[in-house]
Regions:
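Positively charged, low-complexity intrinsically disordered leader regions
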Residues: 1-28
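Short beta-strand segments enriched in small/hydrophobic residues
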Residues: 31-40
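Glycine-rich phosphate/diphosphate-binding loop of Rossmann-like nucleotide-binding domains
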Residues: 39-53, 135-225, 237-245
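Short beta-strand elements in bilobed, periplasmic/extracellular small-molecule ligand-binding domains
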Residues: 56-70, 185-187
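Short, well-structured alpha-helical segments in soluble
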Residues: 76-88
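Anion-binding alpha/beta catalytic cores of soluble intermediary-metabolism enzymes, centered on
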Residues: 95-156
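Short glycine-/small-residue-rich Rossmann-like dinucleotide-binding loops
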Residues: 98, 208-211, 230-231
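Rossmann-fold NAD(P)-binding glycine/threonine-rich loop
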Residues: 106-122, 126, 230-281
Length: 284
């Protein structure tokens, strides 16, 4: 059994991006800029934003966080997003979720210019993914696919993939990406009967249920690849949706939590922002 360390893979990809940004700087061109909109003082959100700020800094990418009061109105939030849409210096826009309850998250996401939607959550980018056209792919699913790339799982013809979870953020986009690579894909979720039996037929098992250590060796086919997308806090420790020690008995590859998908998500956000920059500066 081998462990797919997302943190090591992310550092390798970030090193390549840093070189590209160093080249841009050497040519005295403007640098890529990611703008993050943070509403309120949610400790988890603030921690995630700090992680993004640190990651941008590590590769020389510019980053600006717009902090708004938790009582901000929908109109004020909309105005901030529209200003960022019109700012030619801004390449990527990310609205940190969750927003306070009085704000409409969907309306905020739909306001972002699809060409600056580096989180890949705008309906237009979702449509591009559905129809296999170029567009921004959500960062966590993109990170999962990069992890599969790293072990040579680029063409999944003849492979059966099972995705545990059907969220718009992870489950659905991962299923589409696997399908685009010729895998035969099944999505299971909390209402699926015999979920363990279905999962145990998978050559590639992607787990994104949001239930700590739910998946054990009984869910895993001998020699399967298991990617654990779950992030749960239990007794002050971060754990995934898989019981790592149990799953490792049968899997050929497994991703850990922490040091797995999490670092890859942030890495893909930077990658999308760099791609947006290239699109915005074409012909300059």
């Amino acid at each position: 059994m081998e462990i797919i360390y997302g943190n090591i893979l992310a550092e390798s990809i970030k090193s390549s991006m840093k070189q590209k940004i160093d080249d841009i700087r050497a040519q005295k061109k403007r640098l890529p800029l990611l703008s993050v909109v943070l509403v309120g003082n949610n400790p988890a959100s603030m921690s995630y934003v700090r992680g993004k700020e640190k990651a941008c800094s590590s590769i020389g990418m510019l980053q600006k966080t717009i902090r708004l009061d938790e009582n901000v109105s929908q109109e004020e939030l909309s105005n901030v997003i529209m200003e960022l849409n019109l700012d030619p210096e801004v390449d990527g826009i990310l609205v940190q979720m969750p927003l306070p309850e009085h704000l409409d998250e969907t309306a905020a996401l739909e306001l972002i210019d699809p060409q600056k939607d580096v989180d890949g959550l705008h309906p237009m980018n979702a449509g591009c993914l559905l129809t296999n056209r170029p567009g921004f792919i959500p960062c966590t699913p993109q990170g999962v696919m990069a992890m599969l790339d790293s072990i040579g799982y680029k063409d999944l013809s003849g492979k059966r993939a099972v995705v545990c979870g059907r969220s718009n953020l992870v489950g659905k986009p991962v299923a589409l990406l696997l399908q685009n690579r010729n895998a035969t894909v099944t999505i299971v979720h909390s209402k699926t009967p015999n979920i363990e039996q279905i999962a145990s037929q998978a050559d590639v098992l992607i787990v994104a249920m949001g239930v700590s250590q739910m998946v054990n060796e009984n869910w895993v086919k001998e020699g399967a690849v298991v990617i654990d997308v779950g992030i749960n806090r239990v007794n002050g420790k971060l754990v995934g949706d898989c019981d790592f020690e149990s799953v490792a008995k049968k899997a050929s590859y497994v991703s850990p939590v922490p040091k797995g998908v999490g670092p890859m998500t942030v890495c893909m956000l930077l990658s999308n922002t760099l791609d947006a920059y290239k699109m915005h500066t074409q012909g300059e």
